[in-house]
């Protein structure tokens, strides 16, 4: 599809004068080249998390467009049709495409003749949402880069084109005659024409790669500099001011370096920090660190001598690269598959609830059974009983699992009961130190995942020792040690250089005792790398005699948002509601920038130290493996109201029975956290839970069918309703980010403070009075 400008820009209208036979040969050769470039349509993997249902029909349209491009003399209508097919495949709506056509973007010549800034301005004028605008800009850049890369292969051996002329679209050369080509001059195409890519080796045995080798265009400035604030982009030292300081500037990327540093920069023009940041983010998402997927689902590394990350512009061995092919095939960047048939994968959020196969399960055609706890808060008798048990034992009991009512919720496990951890099942010291041990002067690389928590190097053990706390050094409150308990453990009140909250977890969901310490360290790493005013402060962790827990700062005098809304039943005004929502967005979006997912965002996990301070707790802990333990018959043991917050894609991932070796974990993502935030936002607006009064299996069924919660008679502005509905979009990629939500909440006008005399009231309607 990316070749759709071949005919119009390569001058195919002149082909008949050379004869039908020659024209047919060129047509056949062009089709072969175009089919190879159709593999580049896997660019959609960079744009969306999954594919749409009509991917097959889009592919057929693209193939049809390829054949149309080989026709002689395309008319404007055909060009518009091909252009619309590409934009549709990228993800633009018919209204967006119409807007671009009105702005004279009718073909790829016009698309490549404008700069990124101009294209962004057109998208803003067309009121494209943030996600659609990102798709348009990103697809245009990648599309043009692949055109230039393919052109460098087809024109190997030829001289460089003069600056100022654009790289033409893919031209099929012929040994008998030269096909004239059209060129378009623009600022954007000038930059692209200067991009030089390494020539792909002719031998298929050698590595095939795409190298970032763009030379800088240095020129020495003779102007007198009054300011000495500028620094060298290479050595980060000041450039100085005046004529005596020798420095040069690149005409293309505007880099400024010392003259002595120029020779060490290399051909890196255009390799901006934003580009490197995009590659780094893509690295985290593709490798799926421990915070993104369950560690068992992350594939191990191929070799300890191989780099943990292959940039698209670094060499890739041909034996392991799916892009290695014959010399006539263009080299593709790493991460882009060459299998066109993979485009037909169905879009997950649009499929219905899948029941398990009848031959594998004894229960058929029904949703999983969710066993709900009887209450959300421990009774006085239960707390006293737990206190007596604690005073009798040297350490706290390991029953349950901490859920977060830290938020602390009392979970009544009737049929399953509490199970204490056997001290004999505690992992050995060798298993505990396995993560960071050294042998023979080298490192033992535990490459289960590449993530922030994997600390490599000689200081790895020292870094973990800084946050390791001996369980015996923690003093527990003898009168009332139990603050609360939840689905995944207990929270105890203790003293360790100050008042602390000790969260004790069970790791019974890990069948292999030797892996419990390693799995717990992966969970701890999510807390270990966070520092935010609205996130519970992590002080350390302990692993002793089969006991696993974390020491957190104690929020004194705090209560959960759930307690405030549903127990105290306090009504929140708009100013307080917005302030709480903004702090939630800031805290969770901070976790997302750290590549950490909350996974269990709900009002019970949101503490209020005051109406001006929010604390987020219990993130990154929930998993299907934890939820499935202890094993229930055709269901799961969950806390109350848990199903009210889960996203539709999580509801569709649940099965009636869980198999550790066959079932995948929940498809958690940033979008699922956004859906949960929408439910919390609904609670603060209405004082009620979404799907209130419905049974858990009814809620699961409604979410798998795309049925949204009913909006009651909420007296609020249209902006707030639209914000709420956008968080509940069935398609995950259509939901806004928490950063965008925070910006929208900030943009809402605040209630002005009006100083007026009681004798003369002002008859005006404030913004908050509509709430």
UniProtKB/Swiss-Prot annotation:
Residues 152-172, 290-339, 414-433 are annotated as: Disordered. One of its GO terms (molecular function) is ATP binding. Its cofactor is Mg(2+). One of its GO terms (cellular component) is cytoplasm. It holds the Pfam family PK_Tyr_Ser-Thr. Residues 477-748 form the Protein kinase domain. A zinc finger (Phorbol-ester/DAG-type) spans 215-269. CDD domains: C1. Residues 318-331 have a biased composition (Low complexity). It comes from the Eukaryota. Changing residue 727 to Y: In ku148; restores vulva development in a let-60 n1046gf mutant background. The active site is at 600 (proton acceptor). Gene3D superfamilies: 3.30.60.20, Phosphorylase Kinase, domain 1 (3.30.200.20), Transferase(Phosphotransferase) domain 1 (1.10.510.10). One of its GO terms (biological process) is meiotic cell cycle. Changing residue 531 to H: In ku68; egg-laying defect in 14 percent of mutants. Arrest at the larval stage in 12 percent of mutants and abnormal sex myoblast (SM) migration. Restores vulva development in a let-60 n1046gf mutant background. Residues 152-169 have a biased composition (Polar residues). It is an enzyme of class 2 (transferase). Its EC number is 2.7.11.1. It catalyses: L-seryl-[protein] + ATP = O-phospho-L-seryl-[protein] + ADP + H(+); L-threonyl-[protein] + ATP = O-phospho-L-threonyl-[protein] + ADP + H(+). Belongs to the protein kinase superfamily. TKL Ser/Thr protein kinase family. Interacts with mek-2. Serine/threonine-protein kinase which positively regulates Ras-mediated signaling probably acting at the level of let-60/ras or/and lin-45/raf. Involved in sex myoblast migration. Plays a role in responses to M.nematophilum-mediated bacterial infection by promoting tail swelling and preventing constipation. Functions redundantly with ksr-2 in the Ras-mediated regulation of larval survival, the development of excretory canal and in mpk-1 phosphorylation in somatic cells. This is Kinase suppressor of Ras A. It comes from Caenorhabditis elegans. The lineage of its organism: Eukaryota, Metazoa, Ecdysozoa, Nematoda, Chromadorea.
């Amino acid at each position: 599809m990316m070749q759709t400008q071949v005919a119009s820009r390569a001058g195919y209208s002149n082909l008949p004068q050379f004869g039908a036979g020659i024209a047919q040969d060129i047509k056949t050769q062009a089709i072969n080249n175009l089919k190879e470039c159709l593999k580049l349509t896997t660019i959609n993997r960079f744009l969306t998390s999954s594919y749409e249902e009509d991917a097959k029909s889009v592919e057929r349209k693209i193939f049809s467009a390829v054949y149309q491009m080989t026709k002689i003399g395309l008319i404007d209508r055909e060009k518009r049709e091909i252009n619309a097919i590409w934009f549709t495949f990228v993800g633009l709506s018919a209204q967006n495409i119409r807007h671009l056509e009105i702005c004279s973007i009718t073909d790829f010549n016009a698309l490549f003749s404008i700069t990124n800034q101009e294209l962004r301005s057109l998208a803003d004028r067309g009121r494209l949402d943030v996600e659609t605008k990102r798709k348009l800009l990103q697809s245009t850049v990648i599309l043009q880069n692949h055109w230039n890369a393919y052109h460098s292969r087809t024109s190997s051996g030829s001289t460089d084109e003069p600056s100022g002329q654009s790289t033409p679209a893919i031209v099929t050369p012929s040994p008998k005659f030269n096909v004239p080509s059209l060129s378009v001059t623009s600022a954007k195409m000038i930059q692209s024409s200067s991009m030089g890519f390494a020539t792909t080796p002719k031998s298929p045995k050698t590595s095939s790669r795409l190298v970032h080798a763009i030379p800088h265009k240095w020129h020495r400035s003779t102007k007198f500099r009054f300011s000495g604030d500028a620094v060298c982009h290479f050595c980060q030292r000041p450039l100085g001011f005046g004529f005596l300081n020798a420095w040069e500037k690149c005409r293309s990327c505007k880099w400024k370096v010392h003259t002595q540093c120029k020779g060490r920069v290399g051909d890196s023009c255009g390799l901006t920090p934003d580009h490197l940041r995009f590659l780094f983010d893509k690295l985290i998402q593709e490798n799926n660190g421990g915070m993104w997927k369950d560690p068992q689902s992350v594939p191990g590394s191929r070799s300890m001598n191989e780099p943990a990350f292959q940039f698209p512009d670094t060499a890739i061995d041909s034996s392991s690269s799916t892009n290695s092919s014959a010399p006539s095939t263009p080299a593709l960047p790493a991460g882009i598959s060459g299998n066109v048939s993979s485009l037909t994968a169905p879009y997950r959020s649009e499929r219905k609830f899948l029941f398990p196969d009848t031959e594998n399960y004894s229960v058929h055609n029904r949703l999983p059974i969710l066993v709900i706890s009887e209450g959300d808060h421990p009774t006085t008798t239960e707390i006293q009983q737990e206190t007596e048990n604690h005073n009798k034992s040297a350490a706290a009991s390991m029953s349950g699992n901490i859920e977060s009512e830290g938020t602390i919720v009392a979970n009544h496990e009737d049929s399953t009961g509490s199970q204490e951890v056997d001290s004999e099942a505690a992992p050995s010291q060798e298993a505990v130190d396995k993560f960071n041990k050294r042998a023979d002067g080298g490192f033992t690389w535990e490459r289960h995942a590449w993530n922030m928590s994997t600390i490599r190097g000689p200081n790895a053990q020292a870094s973990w020792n800084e946050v390791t706390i001996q369980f015996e050094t923690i003093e527990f409150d003898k009168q009332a040690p139990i603050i609360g308990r939840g689905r995944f453990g207990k929270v105890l009140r203790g003293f360790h250089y100050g008042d602390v909250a000790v969260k004790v977890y069970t790791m019974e969901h890990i069948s292999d005792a030797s892996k419990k310490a390693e799995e717990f360290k992966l969970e701890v790493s999510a807390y270990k790398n966070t520092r935010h005013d609205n996130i519970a402060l992590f002080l350390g962790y302990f692993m002793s005699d089969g006991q696993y827990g974390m020491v957190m700062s104690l929020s004194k005098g705090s209560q959960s948002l759930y307690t405030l809304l549903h127990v105290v039943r306090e009504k929140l005004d708009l100013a307080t509601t917005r302030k709480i929502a903004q702090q939630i967005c800031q805290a969770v979006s901070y976790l997302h920038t750290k590549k950490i997912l909350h996974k269990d965002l709900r009002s019970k996990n949101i503490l209020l130290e005051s109406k001006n301070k929010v604390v987020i707790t219990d993130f990154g802990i929930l998993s299907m493996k934890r939820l499935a333990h202890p094993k229930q018959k055709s269901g799961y043991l969950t806390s109350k109201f848990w199903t009210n917050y889960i996203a539709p894609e999580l509801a569709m991932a649940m099965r009636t029975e869980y198999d550790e070796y066959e079932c995948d974990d929940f498809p958690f993502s940033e979008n699922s956290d956004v859906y949960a935030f929408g439910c919390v936002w609904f609670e603060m607006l209405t004082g009620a839970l979404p799907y209130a009064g419905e049974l858990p299996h009814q809620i699961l069924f409604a979410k798998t069918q795309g049925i949204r919660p009913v909006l009651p008679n909420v007296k609020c502005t249209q902006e707030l309703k639209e914000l709420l509905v956008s968080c509940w979009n069935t398609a995950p990629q259509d939901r806004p980010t928490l950063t965008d939500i925070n910006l929208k909440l900030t943009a809402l006008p605040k209630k002005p403070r009006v100083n007026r005399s009681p004798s003369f009231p002002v008859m005006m309607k404030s913004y908050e009075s509509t709430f």
